[in-house]
Amino acid sequence: MSTQDSDSIGIVSARRAHFDTPLSLKSGAVLDSYELVYETYGELNADRSNAVLICHALSGNHHVAGVYADNPKNTGWWNNMIGPGKPVDTRKFFVIGINNLGGCHGSTGPISINDKTGKRFGPDFPLVTTADWAKTYVRFADQFSIDCFAAVIGGSLGGMSAMQLALDAPERVRHAIVVAASARLTAQNIAFNDVARQAILTDPDFHDGDYYSHGTHPRRGLRLARMLGHITYLSDDSMASKFGRELRNGSLAFNYDVEFQIESYLHHQGDKFADLFDANTYLLMTKALDYFDPAQDYDGNLSAAFARAQADFLVLSFTSDWRFSPERSRDIVKALLDNKLNVSYAEIPSSYGHDSFLMQDDYYHQLIRAYMNNIAL
């Protein structure tokens, strides 16, 4: 992406917000203080009514749009969605991207130094949930004197975080856009997460999560976890279209080396991810996914759980997403309608599987553009 494009955010930089008030977590643990790394795009208007919070997915972070001056190839993960003239138009909205608590891109997490020990938190960093993140979003908004977000938007785990905030702080959210998400993980999804965790936990370099002091990193386990996850983010059709049974070298080698293009692709994705992500954070994020279940305290009644919500909702799903299928989005829509809340829903034709929410798609983007254009400030 050229930084000169008219619809580009251009050069951006990350900032850091510090919080000294102790944060009580759902696990019972307490963080005496913490920091959140964030980026903003656009300008906060005079009455602070145009703030939009972007919630990231498992492997995402605060770098949602734009590029860095010292690394112009590092484009924000939702750059096709956010910018001047884009579906989330920064000429109208003040957009905020936050690296969640427990992340590994600057916010307080397992790789951070524990002031009490002088060492990295590592495995001692407490598990965090979407409810804990919702608390941090509210505190962040308070620091900016933002009484209410014009919209909270997220895909996948980010969609769950958006729902959580709309439920836990209903007076702070006017609109919630939930994309490719679910109100709870299925048993199959929990199983996928556990297999990914086991790949990391059983890596000899994991050292019970204290690999920092051993000078190691469970790269093999993290690599396998990412490869498994990536398979679930794609669809059979997209894999067939992109790779089929194509061989790297044109003929069978009759050995156990990487032969098929799909194998090469997965190895590349795994290697790249293992170089950039922290294993303890990966474990933590998968547990946040597993634990998300707003109906749990309501005897499994999702409609009762959503009785707290006040926001208007846009819920989007993708036809080929088998990780978070359209049926799961329809469960959310039903719960919202049961509470007579305003909700719009669309099931978007796509062959790209769960990753569709990150893709450039005219129909998908037009739906979000139209919804955002109708938000009055």
Swiss-Prot record:
InterPro entries: AB_hydrolase_1, AB_hydrolase_fold, HAT_MetX-like. Pathway: Amino-acid biosynthesis; L-methionine biosynthesis via de novo pathway; O-succinyl-L-homoserine from L-homoserine: step 1/1. GO terms for molecular function: homoserine O-acetyltransferase activity; homoserine O-succinyltransferase activity. Substrate binds at residues 226, 355. The keyword Amino-acid biosynthesis applies. Gene3D superfamilies: 1.10.1740.110, alpha/beta hydrolase. Homodimer. Residues 50-358 form the AB hydrolase-1 domain. The keyword Amino-acid biosynthesis applies. It comes from Nitrosomonas europaea (strain ATCC 19718 / CIP 103999 / KCTC 2705 / NBRC 14298). It is found in: Cytoplasm. Its main location: cytoplasm. One of its GO terms (cellular component) is cytoplasm. One of its GO terms (biological process) is homoserine metabolic process. It is an enzyme of class 2 (transferase). It catalyses: L-homoserine + succinyl-CoA = O-succinyl-L-homoserine + CoA. Its EC number is 2.3.1.46. Transfers a succinyl group from succinyl-CoA to L-homoserine, forming succinyl-L-homoserine. This is Homoserine O-succinyltransferase. Belongs to the AB hydrolase superfamily. MetX family. Pfam families: Abhydrolase_1. NCBIfam families: homoserO_Ac_trn, PRK00175.1. Keywords: Acyltransferase, Amino-acid biosynthesis, Cytoplasm, Methionine biosynthesis, Transferase. The active site is at residues 156, 321, 354. The record marks 323 as: Important for acyl-CoA specificity.
